[in-house]
Structures are given as structure tokens and as C-alpha cells.
């Protein structure tokens, strides 16, 4: 494999990890926001709606964390190779 190809793969993996990391950070912020909305819910109807949004944001957060972990693992595996 050419050095330029390996460099391109490395850059792609670094970019993918950075995007995944930012996505996870945003998901954490969204979950925190939803928790605040739930805590401030004025009545039962608002609390139920806030709970639904919180559950969805937690699912998104967990998916983003898994993506970031996979991207980081792939980057570390690639960097550990001896070419």
C-alpha cells in the first residue's frame, strides 16, 4: 500500500473520530437540557412530554458514545500498526 494511501486513511480516521467526539459532546448537552426541562415541568402533561424527550436524547447520547468509541478504537488500532 502506498504511503499516500495510508496517510489518507489516517486523516480520515482522525476526522471521523473528531466528528464523533463533537457529536457525543452535543448529545451530552442535549441530554442535560432535557433533564433541566423535566425538572422544571409545571404539570404532569409537561413532565410526560419532557420524559419522552429525555429518553430519546439518552438513546441518541448512547449511540453517539458508541460511535465515538468505535472511531477512537479504529484510530488507535490504525496508529498501532507498523507499516
Predicted region positions:
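Amphipathic alpha-helical coiled-coil segments
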Residues: 24, 53-83
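A short, terminal or domain-edge coil/loop segment
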Residues: 1-5, 37-39, 80-83
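N-terminal functional modules and adjacent low-complexity/disordered segments of proteins
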Residues: 1, 8, 23, 33, ...
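Short E/K-rich amphipathic alpha-helical oligomerization segments
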Residues: 22-56
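Short, charge/polar-rich alpha-helical segments
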Residues: 1-28
Amino acid at each position: 500500500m502506498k504511503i499516500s494511501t495510508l496517510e489518507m486513511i489516517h486523516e480520515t480516521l482522525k476526522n471521523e473520530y473528531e466528528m464523533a467526539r463533537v457529536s457525543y459532546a452535543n448529545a451530552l448537552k442535549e441530554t442535560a437540557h432535557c433533564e433541566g426541562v423535566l425538572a422544571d415541568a409545571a404539570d404532569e402533561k409537561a413532565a410526560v412530554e419532557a420524559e419522552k424527550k429525555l429518553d430519546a436524547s439518552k438513546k441518541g447520547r448512547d449511540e453517539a458514545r458508541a460511535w465515538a468509541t468505535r472511531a477512537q478504537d479504529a484510530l488507535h488500532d490504525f496508529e498501532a500498526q507498523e507499516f
